[in-house]
Amino acid sequence: MNLGVLVSGEGSNLQALIDAGLPIAVVIANKPEARALARAAQAGIAHEVVEHKGLERVAFEDRLLAVLAAHRVEAVVLAGFMRVLTAHFVDHFPQRLINTHPSLLPAFPGADAVAQALAHGVKLSGVTVHFVDHSLDGGPIIAQAAVPVLPGDDRHALHARIRREEHRLLPAVARALATGELACEGRIVRGFAE
């Protein structure tokens, strides 16, 4: 199934998806300065900017949906997309919309998860890939990878270790999504094995 990838910034997760050879039909950035657009262009992938500034949420999401429909996208990967999507968008892709989060959910949802982990003194952190639902980082968990929190870690060091696992895990989950292997029964996701 064709994937659409939504991005906001650097695009390192997008690059991991590109390097994995996934069927990406279009990359959409909500910021024209997003470096991810150059990564898409270099890979020969269609890419567009749909800015959110000055638009109501539903109007912005309608523009996203129009671009995704034009490219026949069947599933969506949020790869560093820094906007919260409403039910209006989410309901178009039931169990076909995934996100990554830099914590072992349900711990530390929302912004600054890495800083929250350090502030709480946890010994393990990590990355979660989950289905997006109507809650903030609360959708059914597809896969997780843990990393140790080392003495002396700061946000940068811990986030770099998490990011390495994210770049490994996200393409594997996205491939399972694209091939239709994932199934969700309540909060239990089946069909993914590393």
List the predicted regions and their residue ranges.
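One-carbon transfer enzymes
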Residues: 1-194
